[in-house]
Amino acid sequence: GVDTEHFYPIPPDEAKQFIGLQPENRMILFVGRIEPLKGVDTLIKAMSCLGIDTPNKESPVHLAIIGGEPDVNPQDMSEEMARLQKICDDLCMGGMVVFLGKRAQDTLPYYYSAAEILVMPSLYESFGMVALEAMACGTPVIASEVGGLGYLVQDGVTGYTVPDSAPEALCEKLSILLGNSDLRNEMGMKAAEYA
């Protein structure tokens, strides 16, 4: 299980203030190692199709990626990080995707709580601790139906499950949740109860 003394819902405004995010800014979060199995490329592609559907300047949505290396010289960057960066460039994502690098474990509850949605687009995942941590913080999760994630996330209750490597399906679920704050809050509450 998850340590609920460490991972619990923090009021979003407080969490956003702690991590330096403006209250109106909306964050979709990925936490994990930057490696091909994690499917971050799928998430970036989903974000790019999201940008087309929801041009909303009042409450800009961005994707924050925690894990791997922060902004380092390209030659020091892992191949996967360079590949993801190139996908961002090719899709003209601009500032919509932010690589935050590693973050201290004790700051993670603030990131989870500040996020509208946590996404785990993995191609394989034995258990999915990050999903459980986010849920304990009251954040709905959209995850691939792989390994333990299919069991952890109750589709339509605590979040959504989507096929892996399917940016369109992921984009559709992101749009639904981003567009419906009541549904997000309800799923978040159920997620926290479940965790």
Predicted regions mapped to residue ranges:
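Nucleotide-activated donor-binding/catalytic signature segment of Leloir-type glycosyltransferases, i.e.
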Residues: 76-103
